[in-house]
């Protein structure tokens, strides 16, 4: 079998992988085999953590809303607040409620009063 010189194609593939590894250190930046392993591992981690990030932020928002409702005695708990919001068909997502709870807690009172007055 004849030998095929793969100079340009192999170099292009390696430089592409090297561009992904530009912020790595040591052998992870210099050795081609190590670069491919670490870049593949980094892609796996980033793919996994994109899904995890959504869960983590939702947990953070729920924690902030729960803390604010308990401190300011809005509905005594997060679950009662969310239940009454859905029962009265007020459309506020958890991200917006958490932002209101952190930045301006007085607006939580207005939201709770609005929930109580709607029949």
UniProtKB/Swiss-Prot annotation:
One of its GO terms (molecular function) is rRNA binding. It is found in: Plastid, Chloroplast. It comes from the Eukaryota. GO terms for cellular component: chloroplast; ribonucleoprotein complex; ribosome. InterPro entries: Ribosomal_bL20 (IPR005813), RIBOSOMAL_L20_CS (IPR049946), Ribosomal_protein_bL20_C (IPR035566). One of its GO terms (biological process) is ribosomal large subunit assembly. Keywords: Chloroplast, Plastid, Ribonucleoprotein, Ribosomal protein, RNA-binding, rRNA-binding. The keyword Transmembrane does not apply. SUPFAM superfamilies: Ribosomal protein L20 (SSF74731). CDD domains: Ribosomal_L20. Belongs to the bacterial ribosomal protein bL20 family. Binds directly to 23S ribosomal RNA and is necessary for the in vitro assembly process of the 50S ribosomal subunit. It is not involved in the protein synthesizing functions of that subunit. This is Large ribosomal subunit protein bL20c.
């Amino acid at each position: 079998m004849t030998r095929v010189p793969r100079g340009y194609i192999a170099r292009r593939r390696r430089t592409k992988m090297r561009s992904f590894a530009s912020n790595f250190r040591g052998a992870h930046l210099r050795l081609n085999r190590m670069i491919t392993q670490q870049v593949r591992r980094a892609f796996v981690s980033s793919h996994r953590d994109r899904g995890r990030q959504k869960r983590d932020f939702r947990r953070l928002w729920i924690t902030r809303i729960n803390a604010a409702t308990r401190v300011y005695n809005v509905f005594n708990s997060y679950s009662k607040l969310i239940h009454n919001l859905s029962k009265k068909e007020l459309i506020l997502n958890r991200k917006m409620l958490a932002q209101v709870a952190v930045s301006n807690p007085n607006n939580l009172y207005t939201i709770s009063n609005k929930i109580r007055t709607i029949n």
